[in-house]
Structures are given as structure tokens and as C-alpha cells.
């Protein structure tokens, strides 16, 4: 009996080391950033079983077998649709400003189509204004409405949007709603999901959380886009979820969320529609390619309309494009660069680009919330402050709530707005969307919004920052080490 237990013990030990070695080899063989690999190895060696389970659950990009097959199957028809769209030559821009030229060339070469022109844009910075405008557009819809949000939180004006959407479905408008399973858990536990389906709305729970399949699909891969398309002509996107800030996370201690949304009319709605159709097919298997844009761009629209490139990220879309776009934007800056983000955990490349811009004389400002709803990200972001301040970057800490706006403005003319946070999860993991806008008028509007944020912020003093307590520095470095995983 003693011999039996000895053999079993040795087999368990051998199996343990084989498992550790196998996971280590798998991490090393994957194409990933060195800091990310080192962070995973440290976790696995310090907490072996917990680390291995965490890595198998969250360490690799698993879309799931069924979704991966759908993504492969949809590409030929999507590619044909994009090729056919090129026949609508009147919607594509032929020239761009000098500051936007490099970025638009990058987007065109990687996505296969140029930016679209003749769009009319309106920036909305108040949640009530966003929802009232959306309700009006829903009430005037004639054919179809498509929506996708990371979070839909019942309560307040979000319920009025839901009521207007159900009324539209009852009068014959084809309504589709896709919500992330994790982000919108409160919605799916409420009566609203059943009420909407009973009204005729197609409601899809995207990337459904299922602990029984935790090793078959990455659970923290999330549908993070916020988009609305109406009649293939009106579109919304930005940082705002379908929540009323007065009812959302009131016990988080960070104040009301502050967001920005863009309301658009024009061909950009078609570009966003193809992104939505891909998401819908990956999730449901149903193909809903949008029709070509039924618009004739008049001369005055061509002269005054905004030129926009739509960049989507996530499985099935050009890899690393949003990250490349941010790098290109930073390196294109000549006068000033302003960034706003709630979560700041940049890649080494992006951090280097931001610091280099400041060191070559560009006026660089980053606006972050003073209080963050994520303790981990809050501490990790502080670990980058010393290097940024040393390079001459201005760091503004917003004190008017949780600044949730994601925006970049370069030289007053090139703008990026959308759903992308400046962290690893948004840059390389989630389904995200960003608009790249080449227009000085829109840039002026965005600059006014960012100036308002700065007026409600405190400029971080580099002299005081270096005097912070030792325990804070240690905590920052600890979270900095694990920043590639956040």
C-alpha cells in the first residue's frame, strides 16, 4: 500500500510539473508582448493552480468554435459587399488634410475602402440631449433600427428609449437590439427583455456568460461597442451606454458618468452598418448586409460635410488597427495632442509615442478622471505618470464625475471618438469602434468639449507628484507589473 501511495504521489508531482511546463511553453510560443507573457508566468509560478485556471480562462483569445466558424464563413460575402460599395465612388473622399493623410491611408489600405464624405455630425455631451435626440429619431424611423450597447441599465430616461423602441416595433419598424451579456446583466434579469421581444424586437444576448464553457471561450472578451443605426442613414456612436447617469452606479463613489456621443447623417451610417452586420452574423448566424447608401451628395455637402473613417476592432476585423491608428495620430501631431479616457493603461509603444510627441515640442494633454470605478486600473494608470510628466505631458485630473469620454484631438483637425479606452483590453481584445474624422469644424467642437473638461480638472503638479508617499509608489509598481493583463 505504501508503494502504491508513493507511485501516486510521484505521478501527481510529475503531472503537476508537466502541466506547468506545458502552459509555460504555450505562453512562450504565443505571439504576445513580452510584458504580458512575463506577467502571466509570474502569476502561474506564484499561484500555480489559480494561475493556470486564470490563463486558460482569460489568457488567450478564444471566440468560441461556433462564432469562429461564422466569422470565417461570412468573410467572402462581406468582402464582396465592400468591393461592390466601391462602385459608389461619389461617397468616398479623394483628399485629406495634411495631418490626417497618413492615418486615412493606413485605414484605407488595411480596410480596403477610403473614408466617406458628405456626413453631417453633431456632438452631444448631455445624456438627456442624447436620449431625447435618439427618441425623436426612433419615432421618425421608417424602415429599420439597429442598436448595440455594452450596458443597458433600466431606469430613468433609458426606459423612455425602450418604450419608444417598442412602439416603433409595433408599428412595423424592423428593430434589432444586441447587448453584451456581462455588461447588461441587469437588463436581462429585468422584465424589459421579455417585453421587448413580445413587442417584436429581436433581442440578442451577445457573448453569453456561461461558466460551464469557461475553457472553451474567453469570458472577458466583451461586446463593447455603442452604436445606433436608423434607416441606414442616421447613426450614433460614442462612449455612452444606454444608461441614465442619475440612476447608474450611484454607490460607486465616483459621481455621475460624463460621456460624449456623435449623431451623424450620411454614408457613415452604411460603414457602421457593415460592422453591425458582422457582429450580428457572428452572434446569430443570420446575414443582414446593409444596402448601398441611397444618398446623392450635393456640392454644398461635399464642401461642408465631414470625412470619416470607421475603424472596428475585435475578432474578424483587421488586427491591431485601432492601436496603429492611435500611434499614427500621436506621431502626426505637430502643434497639440489632447486625449481623454477613463482608463489609461497604454502599451509601451503608445506610451513612447505620447512622450515622444511632448519631447519634440507638441503640447500634449491627457485628461483622466480623478476618481475611478476600477481600483486596479486606477493604480496601474498612476504608474505611468512619472514618465509622462518627465516628458512634458500635462495630466489633468477631472473632478466633475467619472469622465468616460474616449477622444483624441490632433492639431484641431484630426479627431478620434468612439468606444476605445487607452488600455490593453480595448486595444487588443474587445469589440470596439472608433470614428476617425478629418474636419476642422468638428475639431473645433471637440476642442470646446475638451476645454470644458479641463476647466473642471486639476493639473497634476510634477513637484508634488514626486513627493507622494513610498507606499503609493510601491502599490503603483505592483499594479504596473500586472498592467498588461488589465
UniProtKB/Swiss-Prot annotation:
InterPro entries: Cardiolipin_synthase, CL_synthase_A, CLS_N, PLD-like_dom, PLipase_D/transphosphatidylase. It is a multi-pass membrane protein. Its main location: membrane. SUPFAM superfamilies: Phospholipase D/nuclease (SSF56024). Its EC number is 2.7.8.-. GO terms for cellular component: plasma membrane. It catalyses: 2 a 1,2-diacyl-sn-glycero-3-phospho-(1'-sn-glycerol) = a cardiolipin + glycerol. The chain crosses the membrane at residues 3-23, 38-58. Keywords: Cell inner membrane, Cell membrane, Lipid biosynthesis, Lipid metabolism, Membrane, Phospholipid biosynthesis, Phospholipid metabolism, Repeat, Transferase, Transmembrane, Transmembrane helix. It comes from the Bacteria. One of its GO terms (biological process) is cardiolipin biosynthetic process. CDD domains: PLDc_EcCLS_like_1, PLDc_EcCLS_like_2. GO terms for molecular function: cardiolipin synthase activity. The keyword Iron does not apply. Residues 219-246, 399-426 form the PLD phosphodiesterase domain. It is found in: Cell inner membrane. Catalyzes the reversible phosphatidyl group transfer from one phosphatidylglycerol molecule to another to form cardiolipin (CL) (diphosphatidylglycerol) and glycerol. Belongs to the phospholipase D family. Cardiolipin synthase subfamily. ClsA sub-subfamily. This is Cardiolipin synthase A. The gene is clsA.
